[in-house]
């Protein structure tokens, strides 16, 4: 059975003695799922998994989704390719939760590092549950019944502004109209409350004249260093994060 060691941060755990290229047994799956819910992001080293292994692992946790804007592995549309260099720098450097422009965003994301830069390239994660816990009662009451709009168009505005960008992403725009999510959600496993907004995809609070100031406060609050952990990548490292309760961003 694999071992789980909590990080020194408010979230995250390292999982060792675990070979993700092999089929997980029922007890192993349950332990991993509980650990994901509890620690919010799990880190693995030296995982030599194939595309088939990657897809099989992800499928244990629910229905897989294909990203509408990024290239994917041939024959494996559920596996997104994230690749950047000097000619193709990353456009996504804001804190975000994956694909909240969907009515039902994915439960989590499983990212494996294959080509690691000599410097930079770390990933930061931030816990939205601990951030909620630290809100004062007035803010908790104020936010409880609010809804926010999450938008693909808002999140990919830089790509859409490029020459030919709107034509290239026309299908993604059509298939992903703006959606509404509660500002405060409850995690289905832990029961913890979560501040469910992110700077990349959340465009505004529905029907509230104070939308701008509320989001400004929330973004400043959830981006604080005390809620973060940092992961330094190595070849064949894996980060598996709970998309229901954390933000993440690359460090470039």
Task: Annotate each PLM feature.
Residues 2-235, 243-252:
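Non-heme Fe(II) oxygenase catalytic core, chiefly the N-lobe of the double-stranded beta-helix
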């Amino acid at each position: 059975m694999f071992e789980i060691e909590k990080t020194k941060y408010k979230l995250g755990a390292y999982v060792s003695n675990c070979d993700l290229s092999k089929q997980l047994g029922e007890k192993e799956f349950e332990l991993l799922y509980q650990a994901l819910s509890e620690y919010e992001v799990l880190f693995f080293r030296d995982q030599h998994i194939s595309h088939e292994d990657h897809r099989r692992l992800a499928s244990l946790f629910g229905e897989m989704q294909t990203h509408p804007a990024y290239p994917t592995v041939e024959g494996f549309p559920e596996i997104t390719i994230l690749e950047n260099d000097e000619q193709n720098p990353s456009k996504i450097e804001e804190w975000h939760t994956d694909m909240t422009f969907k009515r039902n965003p994915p439960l989590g994301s499983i990212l494996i590092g294959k080509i690691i830069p000599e410097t930079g390239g770390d990933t930061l994660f931030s816990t939205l549950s601990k951030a909620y816990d630290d809100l004062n009662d007035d803010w908790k009451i104020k936010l409880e019944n609010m809804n926010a709009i999450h938008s693909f168009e808002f999140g990919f505005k830089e790509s859409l502004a490029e020459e030919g960008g709107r034509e290239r992403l026309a299908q993604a725009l059509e298939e992903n109209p703006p959606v509404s999510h509660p500002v405060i959600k409850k995690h289905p496993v832990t029961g913890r409350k979560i501040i469910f907004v992110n700077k990349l995809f959340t465009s505004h609070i529905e029907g509230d004249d104070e939308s701008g100031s509320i989001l400004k406060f929330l973004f400043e609050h959830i981006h604080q260093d005390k809620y973060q952990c940092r992961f330094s990548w190595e070849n064949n490292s894996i980060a598996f994060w709970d998309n229901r309760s954390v933000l993440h961003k690359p460090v470039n």
